[in-house]
Amino acid sequence: MRKMLSVILLIVICLSAAHCATAENIRVTVVPPSCTEAGYTLYESIESGITTVHDEVPATGHQFGEWQEDPRSGGSQRVCKVCGYAEARSSKPISSFPIVYLNGNTAGISKSERVTLEFAFESEETSFSCYAYTTWQGHQTLNYPKKNYTIRLYDDEEISHKHKLSFNRWQYEHKYVLKANYRDISAVRNLIAADIWADMASARPHLYPKLLKTSHYGAVDGFPVAVYLNDEFHGLYNMNLHIDDDLYRMTDQYDAVMIANSSEPEETRFFSPALFIDEKDAWEVEYCGTGNDNQWAKDKLNELIGFVINSSDEEFRRDLGAYLDVNGAIDYLIFIYITGLDNNAAKDLVLLKYQGSDVWIPTVYDMERAFGLARDGEAYVAANEFLPTENNGVWDSNTNSLLWDRLLQNYTDEIRMRYRRLRTGILTTDALTERVREAISEIPPQYYNMDMETYPRCLLAELPEEQMTDYIQSRLPLLDMALLGNLVIEDGDSMEDSY
């Protein structure tokens, strides 16, 4: 365990640029970095109890010795000279495609009941073994035969020491989701959409500083894997980072994550306040720095919803930025238009709030229906569905959401300018179709076949790669016309104006 150094300091807090007032006692706790966890300085007000984290120092990383043969596994291992963590290397032939092996008794597993399984990961880049504290994950997806899993990795079967990893550009983490993508036989729609969001966010002015430190600019991050359960093929999955405080680099007491669970209730469509009756209600507190004492976060969300409902157009345009990251909201609306994710106008909208700011930042989650997949996965959606419309200066976002209707009506010029900049830059038709081809080509065909044999479901007439590229090529000109009128966009166009 890392040593903590605590001292009491008297710090003068400057309340304005012109005056310095009120001094309060601050307890300062310095936590040095370890092999897998960042160091930081924790400031706690003795009077108010409010804590903040500053001066973060990256984890040092393991300092491994030489690889040694391990008679127990038949492979080899190397041990960190600092913390004693042992990294294993299998003697099995290494697959060019990542494989996850789970072994153990899964009887009784559910969303609330966990089981401990042996876990092994194999790829060309890395291999390791440990234990996985495993549950089912999701809401509606629990009804499908192919389940999502939340896995928490530990060094020991007693789950007393976290097994934190740093691979695939990720920080040291131990919580992951094995996403089944039951409706999406391509297994890549969610990943492609997340990459698009990350590209948009990276090109956004004034991105919140902590999002710059995340692996994917606030989007879910992952990659395809083949999963074997007790030595039998269990399915083609995505191994994603878990949606929590670590994903969003939240370290302070008054940080929070909200997620919309459904597109049906008026609360997630910003027509009425959030009620928070239970975890299956419209809005869910996915994370709160103050734990179950989260009423303040619920109140902050309802302040945003109330503003959207009650403000005049003049107030909405002038003051929205006090409640919601406007640039992020503009990108979110453009994103769901580009990808055709009409359901994500409400459901799976994620809102982030960091301590020191009252502004909610929108980000994306669960995008396996991107590029024209119907909600049940049994059909494809036409490219001309879910487009904004304008009639005599009055815009309809066609999202059935008061937030997006009002944003499109009151920030029309900013949305159109940002859209054109993206379409003539990182979101050209060629760039998007190439993403699709590359993502599908990375998965060996035999795993697609094995997944369909394991989970027989509707075989659509058009193959996923062909359908997605056709959808993009057909939809984008329609969206260009809907948002920009007769201004034709061609690959290679450029635009200098910023939004």
Where are these regions (language model features)?
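Thrombospondin type-1
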Residues: C20-S90
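Conserved NTP-binding catalytic cores of kinases and kinase-like/nucleotidyltransferase enzymes
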Residues: V82-G84, R89-D195, Y499
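A conserved helix-loop-beta module that forms one wall/lid of the active-site cleft
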Residues: I185-A226
